[in-house]
Amino acid sequence: MEEIPSLVIDPGSCWTRFGYAGEESPMTILPSYYGVRSDVTGRNKYVVDELQIHAPIPGMEVKNGKSNGIIQDWESTLYTWERGLKEKLQVNPTEYAMMITEPSWNPQSVRQQIMEAAFEQLHVPAFYLTKQAVCVAFANSKSTALIVDIGSDNASVTPVVDGLIIRKGIFKQSLAGDFLNANIEQLFNTMNIEFPPHYRIARKSVAIQQSGNMANGSADAVKPAVLYPPIQDLTSSYEIFQKRRVIEEWKESVLDVLDTPFDEAKASSRNPKPFEFPDGVTHKFGQERFRISEILFNPSFSASRSAETTPPQGSVGLHELVYQSILACDSELRSPLLNNIVVTGGTSLIPGLSERLQAEVQRLATGSRINVHTAETASATSNAVWFGGSILASLDNFQHLWVSKQEYDEVGVDRALFVEKRCK
């Protein structure tokens, strides 16, 4: 096939990234969450831009087109892809080969649908579907690695050997970002912390100095926040989405992981961290910021007061999930995999997590050399899947792997088997 420029789409659970193969970072990032409301004709009208989706629009439902990393809603997904390509990148997909990333457990039926969407809706001349774990390995300059991806809806461990997935070593569970969010919400309820969403804030609360106390770091009084009037007909999904936004902000700025299994005295001895809620009210958090993150290593630390905070049966600590994956691999592969553990995903950015994981895996794999690798920056971690795809799609020895439109047309009805064979 004649070499043509290529694009990479990484449709993650929280964000969808678009850009040119060969570049170090995506050009455009759109939320995988989307807003949808009916227009006067009854047709769906989608909102996919980050700023617009946070606007309080009456009647707008906020949804996610993916579940467990798998595309479920094709209409909204294609709308997002077309907006990212045609309006944000301002490219014509018919002029570019298209690489799209996928989770290692993507079912055959969805793989077929992705290929059909690329050729029949986007009308690309060439296409390839590549595993996200393989992309992360290449983004970290490795062809063999154990990829530990801690995202929003699940934590997964995937062995990659010589650029190929070892399927029997794939392990995943739902103890990840969303599960922590549910526990954070429960923590706020327990602490009687209530906060208005960002869109209600007209003016934050203000500390008032009346007798010189501000110089000592305190105030005599607080002028409360001013809120905009309630907006009628906002949907419950929008309100939940806005609460999630604040919880995510809290998680990113407050959580820490202890370097040893949770110890109350040790956690209490660490300085508390303050967090300013949207209305300007600040609360300090001590041992609870370690207790929440401990759930990733010890599921019994979950609140377990509702279905959302009860660990699914069979849930294990992250280090145990890693070790299960290692033991499922052939013995000669275990040493190179343990020496090349790569941690990625948004939830992996909690300070101290990688160091704790290394210590816990070392305890399980006594005598083995353990090396846990992380990207140098938060953005490099967040963009690792996309960047790995960018590297792969631009390699000279990859060009013969593209599936051409002519090949696709010649396959006929056996497309599911075809995509399994060509995109491994």
Swiss-Prot record:
UniProt protein name: SWI/SNF and RSC complexes subunit arp42
GO cellular component, one term: chromatin
Coiled-coil stretches noted in the UniProt entry, renumbered to this chain: none
Keyword Cytoplasm on entry: yes
Signal peptide from the UniProt entry: none
Family, similarity comment: Belongs to the actin family.
One GO BP annotation of this record: transcription initiation-coupled chromatin remodeling
GO molecular function, one term: chromatin binding
Disulfide bonds: none
Highest taxon listed in the record's lineage: Eukaryota
Taxonomic path: Eukaryota, Fungi, Dikarya, Ascomycota, Taphrinomycotina
